[in-house]
């Protein structure tokens, strides 16, 4: 995490006072009538009209919460347009700046740092990784589908980022089959590509939650896992992911879901099953029926 953060910060130009030209804000498109299916198009239209960089970098809650990275001027244009639309629509404040953020995290602006971050990962990750630890258990936000050692999964990486490593695996004759002969090494290769490109790609949490919570197909070709419990490992005072899961489960798509949502610190007694009262055995003499004299 430290290496990733350091690399991200080093990629952003700063003036003599240490200030960058980037900020981040939270957008609530439901306040002005834009739904999840059209929010990307909306943000792109503001970027094009203003001539400034804007990108949704965190897809948090369908229709309701998106983090947008952009230039100072770009976010100003987005703020003004969203406010105008919300006023016309009768909605509440649709845009707020995220304080203290001046790096366009998870945006394409950082793609020039992917190679350096890959090198950092390569130096720190073991030569082989047991596939059983990741296959069907790890859902990378880069692709928002469970990890697999399949050509289809590798292609899903190439569908969103120009990974030369994955391109060679898929397009050079015999390369995929040769790599598959050593599953531990292939798992490592794909993991490194997923992590280094996630560094400069949006967090697709809406789709990831859909995979976790859906009992049917979560996306074309991607089966839902249908979990019955979500346990966030994080601060109980700020249960961000638990709150997002709870709000997601209120959507009509999950009306029939019966998923329990916990934060490990806030709901520790439930998570560790220590909230059940223990009934001690009573002495035999106390439970024996009374007898006639």
Q: What residue ranges belong to the model's regions?
A:
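Alpha/beta catalytic cores of group-transfer enzymes, especially the acyltransferase/condensing modules
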Residues: 1-171, 176-179, 183
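Acyltransferase/transacylase module recognition
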Residues: 104, 108, 112, 119-292
């Amino acid at each position: 995490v430290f290496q990733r953060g350091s690399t991200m910060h080093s990629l952003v130009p700063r003036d003599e006072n240490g200030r960058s030209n980037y900020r981040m804000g939270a957008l609530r498109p439901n306040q002005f009538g834009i739904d999840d299916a059209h929010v990307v198009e909306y943000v792109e239209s503001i970027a094009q009209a203003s001539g400034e960089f804007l990108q949704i970098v965190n897809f948090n809650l369908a229709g309701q919460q998106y983090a947008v990275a952009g230039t100072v001027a770009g976010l100003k244009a987005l703020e003004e347009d969203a406010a105008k639309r919300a006023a016309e629509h009768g909605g509440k404040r649709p845009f707020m700046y995220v304080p203290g953020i001046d790096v366009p995290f998870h945006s394409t602006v950082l793609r020039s740092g992917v190679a350096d971050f890959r090198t950092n990962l390569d130096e720190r990750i073991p030569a082989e990784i047991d596939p059983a630890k990741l296959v069907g258990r790890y859902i990378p936000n880069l692709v928002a589908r469970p990890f697999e050692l399949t050509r289809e999964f590798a292609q899903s990486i190439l569908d969103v980022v120009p990974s030369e490593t994955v391109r060679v695996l898929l397009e050079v004759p015999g390369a995929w089959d040769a790599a598959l002969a050593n599953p531990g090494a292939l798992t490592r290769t794909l993991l490194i590509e997923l992590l280094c490109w996630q560094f400069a790609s949006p967090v697709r949490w809406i789709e990831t939650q859909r995979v976790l919570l859906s009992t049917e197909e979560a996306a074309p070709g991607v089966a839902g896992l249908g979990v019955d419990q979500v346990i966030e490992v994080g601060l109980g005072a700020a249960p961000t992911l638990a709150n997002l899961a709870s709000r997601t489960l209120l959507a009509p798509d999950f009306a029939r879901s019966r998923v329990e949502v916990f934060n490990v610190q806030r709901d520790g007694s439930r998570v560790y099953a220590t909230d059940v009262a223990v009934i001690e055995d009573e002495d035999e003499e106390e439970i024996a029926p009374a007898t006639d004299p």
